[in-house]
């Protein structure tokens, strides 16, 4: 596992998700603020398909770390891109109502799975508050 800066990344064509997808739009906005523009080797709809193509060696791909977990070791490597903000994932509920028992049970299971599995996933940083 290595590290590359966003300026270095811009020197190479990479496979990306298409414009109009949440991940790509957030990425383009963040890179534009840094004055960096990427060259697309291909635009592929679907993070798992994009990860699979990169794993098979078609071209490097820019993906969230969660999209590449589970691939066996081989002739590929996970490279951290410095200069990109970490993405956050949250669990949202309405504060004006009391959560139902099934909602609370689902929340508890989600938190348990995150605490158990996420720390073992490369590139995933757990920041649970409670």
Language-model region placement:
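Residue-level signature of the cytosolic catalytic core of signaling kinases
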Residues: 2, 19, 23, 42, ...
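Short beta-strand-to-loop elements that line the ligand-binding cleft
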Residues: 16-17, 36-49
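C-terminal regulatory/oligomerization modules of transcriptional regulators
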Residues: 126-130
